[in-house]
Amino acid sequence: MRQIMEIAMHPSVRTCWNCNPGEVMNGSIKHSWEMLREFQGQVIHIHDLYDDKYPYRELFGLLKAMNYGGYCLSESPATADPVRVMHYYRMLFSLLTSPAGAAKS
């Protein structure tokens, strides 16, 4: 992907981080993230935030470090109560962006 971005090299061409298992190496996304960080656009594609197989806390820390102000798109199963699910996501966002172990109420 980095090679594609280097060839494209245009300010309108950006990546969308997709939270795929293939970018996790030894439990971390740091290496993959650093390869593409300079090309990151304003969209992140997330899956279920409760899934501990993906290092979401690390991702949110990296986003916070770059003052990310974009959007997070959630790919999650359909629900009969989307407002309730959004409240859960809001709480998870708060937990994932707070210092490790700290919970906001």
Predicted regions and their residues:
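Histidine-acidic metal/acid-base catalytic patches
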Residues: M1-S105
